[in-house]
Amino acid sequence: GFSGCPGSGPGDKKPNWVTCAWPPDYLEILDWQWNEVVLPYWSKMNTELGDAGVKFAFEMHPGFVVYNTDTMLRVRRECGDNIGANFDPSHLFWQGMEPVECVKALKGCIYHVHAKDSIVHQTNAAVNGVNDYKSYGDEINRSWIFRTCGYGHDLKWWNDFFSTLRMVGYDGAISI
């Protein structure tokens, strides 16, 4: 599932995904989102999940407040361990993260895994960066695209990924 992304203040009906710390207005938005909406909501949900014997896994996905390792660890630390990660490396690659290192950092809180690949088209990214809003139907012009496993990263990378998952104790499903 996804963490959601509140607006920039009470009454806003559209999400506001903050991606930078300047100007200071953005930090105020983040403070409001996390302290007034995200943490209270997911703390309550964590309790309800526990009462029901359910674990909930966030897919760390750009556009939502939980989109990287740091935000995943924060929501878990502040809300509880009925919340964990649905680990999908495809969203991390194009953000410039190394998913194998993220798996190590998330040891003990990975509840599900997607085997999905992506690739950054360096020539497009060199001109436009990776926060790309172009349609997925316009792959030739996008800075990054989703790929079948092995068509973005090689077999050695995938072997290292699955081995690292096992090393940190993950023994669950892999969804393709």
What are these regions (language model features)?
Residues 43-47, 51, 65-176:
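Histidine-acidic metal/acid-base catalytic patches
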Residues 1-84, 159:
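Active-site acidic/histidine proton-transfer and metal-coordination neighborhood
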